[in-house]
Amino acid sequence: MLVWLAEYLVRYETAFNAISYITVRAILALLTALFISLWIGPKVIKRLQILKFGQEVRNDGPESHFAKKGTPTMGGVMILFSIGVSTLLWANLANSYIWVCLFVLFGYGAIGFVDDFRKITRKNTDGLIARWKYFWMSVVALVAILWLYWLGHDTDATRLVIPFFKDIMPQLGLFYIVLSYFVIVGTGNAVNLTDGLDGLAIMPTALVAGAFALIAWATGNVNFAEYLHIPYIKYSSEVVVFCTAIVGASLGFLWFNTYPAQVFMGDVGSLALGGALGVVAILVRQEFLLVIMGGVFVVEALSVILQVGSYKLRKQRIFRMAPIHHHFELKGWPEPRVIIRFWIISLMLVLMGLVTLKLR
């Protein structure tokens, strides 16, 4: 929005021309989202306490989690608000990719909000009925995918980038829709499953979003795209602003969510952030890179799938409890140790993912 204002004001003061640079707006978006999150955080937490929007805890979970019961949840609303305001202020709103990203963010956020609200009003951990939850997640995902498919300016927009192989980029055609569906829905659920400990999901989210900011910038720059042998997606560099807004909002939320947490993001935050990462990965054609950099999310989701599958087939559990972070808790790891080690792993995976861009 401020891009348009700067275009007018530059006639009178050339310093406003700085706002036309994507790097400047990306930094400002990060700082804006961070400051908004820090500013409204105490107010949101107090309001959630007044409304008695407290966390419900599973009876079969680790005993250390019983003390978390009643901690304000649905704090993801402050994340969404911070990202939304920051993006609307600093992004070029004439860019359709920005609206696709915001659509998924708030679409999944709305689904998560309803899910959280049902848990709170029913005083248990059962939210939306699974089939309805997946139905609405699928609707949002498919609308966004078809929107992106329609926006595709050239064949590169539907190519599949395979790490380590610069000359292998198959054209997906309509399979692009199928792959993209699983990426968005899968990432939304994976981040949701990861959000079980204080700060566990939000830091990897910030790291992955920061990495995708760099990738989106390179993808939208014809020279860097050619240098890295990745598809050049026209206008995709504007998504950098959205990604850095996620980073800023995530860091601001972490201020209140770090152990011991003052607030939880709830499904309204985790589903929204997961969906946002998924749609950005599709937009910049780096689905495989999302699997690498978001490895913590992938492992958390796989642990649940393996646990459920093993119990149904063999009546035996692989882990003491799934998602896998609970397994380590039941083995005696203190919660902060699990969190910090997962953060370290996430940082290493993000760096590995970025390195693969050059090792091709």
Swiss-Prot record:
Topologically, how does it sit relative to the membrane?
Multi-pass membrane protein
Q: Which cofactor does it need?
A: Mg(2+)
Any Pfam family hit: MraY_sig1
Catalytic activity as recorded in UniProt: UDP-N-acetyl-alpha-D-muramoyl-L-alanyl-gamma-D-glutamyl-meso-2,6-diaminopimeloyl-D-alanyl-D-alanine + di-trans,octa-cis-undecaprenyl phosphate = di-trans,octa-cis-undecaprenyl diphospho-N-acetyl-alpha-D-muramoyl-L-alanyl-D-glutamyl-meso-2,6-diaminopimeloyl-D-alanyl-D-alanine + UMP
Give GO terms for biological process.
cell division; cell wall organization; peptidoglycan biosynthetic process; regulation of cell shape
Q: What does this protein do?
A: Catalyzes the initial step of the lipid cycle reactions in the biosynthesis of the cell wall peptidoglycan: transfers peptidoglycan precursor phospho-MurNAc-pentapeptide from UDP-MurNAc-pentapeptide onto the lipid carrier undecaprenyl phosphate, yielding undecaprenyl-pyrophosphoryl-MurNAc-pentapeptide, known as lipid I.
Q: What is this protein called?
A: Phospho-N-acetylmuramoyl-pentapeptide-transferase
Organism for this UniProt entry:
Haemophilus influenzae (strain 86-028NP)
Gene name, per UniProt, is: mraY
